């Protein structure tokens, strides 16, 4: 399974002129390698771009992207990584969605398709990143 970060799907759905082409190439490459999925955190981040659940589900189905729940072990890891971030003078006061997504990939030993390769590798060095 390859997990997809929100930024890649936003590039595709919003037709971002700067990133759509590169993200589409990376998406197609990932799809040729393994099944694609997002977790519930990514689903929530995508929701504001759609008028209802049915349309978001249809958009994901059209791309053959499954939605998988985030395991408790990934949530636990995300909390600990966030704590490390705060100790290193991180300014965000809540656990960042990127930590949930990266922790999910780490716990599932899944590759992660993302534009935030540097941040993922900094906090989740075992995660194999696919980046446009």
Features from the language model and the residues they span:
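Histidine- and aromatic-rich ligand-binding microenvironments
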Residues: 4-5, 38-39, 94-95, 116-117
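Short, well-structured N-terminal submotif of metal-dependent ribonuclease cores
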Residues: 1-38, 47-59, 130
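Short loop->beta-strand "edge-of-pocket" segments that line small-molecule binding or catalytic clefts
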Residues: 2, 35-37, 64-69, 111
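Structured helix-beta-strand junction loops
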Residues: 32-33, 62-66, 108, 126
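Acidic, PIN/NYN-like endoribonuclease modules and their adjacent C-terminal/linker elements
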Residues: 1, 28, 102-132
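Active-site-proximal, substrate-binding regions of enzyme catalytic domains
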Residues: 51-73
């Amino acid at each position: 399974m390859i997990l997809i970060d929100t930024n890649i799907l936003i590039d595709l759905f919003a037709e971002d002129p700067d990133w759509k082409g590169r993200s589409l190439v990376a998406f197609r490459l990932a799809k040729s390698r393994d099944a694609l999925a997002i977790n519930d955190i990514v689903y929530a981040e995508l929701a504001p771009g759609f008028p209802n659940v049915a349309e978001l589900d249809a958009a994901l189905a059209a791309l053959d992207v499954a939605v998988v729940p985030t395991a408790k072990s990934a949530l636990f890891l995300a909390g600990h990584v966030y704590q490390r971030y705060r100790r290193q003078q991180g300014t965000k006061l809540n656990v960042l969605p990127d930590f949930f997504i990266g922790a999910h990939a780490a716990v599932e030993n899944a590759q992660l398709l993302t534009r935030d390769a540097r941040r993922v590798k900094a906090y989740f060095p075992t995660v194999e990143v696919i980046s446009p």
